[in-house]
């Protein structure tokens, strides 16, 4: 049954284990990256909304100032 020395089988098991850990770490890193991207996207959307509100209120103020010519 043993065609190779025991240490060869141990190396093969080590390679398989390393590949498994590599895939698991890559998936975990992808989750962390996705969470970071979503957080940064939410911050960006909040900034855009605040800027839109600021411009809208600024535009309304300018319209009100233009109408009250005395």
UniProtKB/Swiss-Prot annotation:
InterPro entries registered for this protein in UniProt: Spore_YhaL
Subcellular location: Cell membrane
GO BP terms, alphabetized: sporulation resulting in formation of a cellular spore
Key words, A-Z: Cell membrane, Membrane, Sporulation, Transmembrane, Transmembrane helix
Induction remarks: Expression controlled by a sigma-E-regulated promoter which needs the sigma-E factor for the binding of the RNA polymerase and subsequent transcription.
One Gene Ontology term, aspect cellular component: plasma membrane
Listed transmembrane segments: 3-23
Annotated region (Disordered), positions in chain: 48-70
Organism field: Bacillus subtilis (strain 168)
Lineage: superkingdom: Bacteria
Protein name in the entry: Sporulation protein YhaL
Record's signal peptide: none
Membrane topology: Single-pass membrane protein
A Pfam family it matches: Spore_YhaL
UniProt function note: Required for efficient sporulation.
């Amino acid at each position: 049954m043993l065609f190779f020395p025991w240490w060869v089988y141990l190396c093969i098991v080590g390679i398989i284990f390393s590949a498994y850990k590599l895939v698991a770490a890559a998936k975990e890193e992808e989750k962390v990256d996705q969470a970071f991207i979503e957080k940064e996207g939410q911050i960006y959307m909040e900034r855009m909304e605040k800027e839109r509100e600021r411009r809208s209120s600024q535009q309304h103020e300018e319209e009100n100032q233009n109408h009250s010519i005395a």
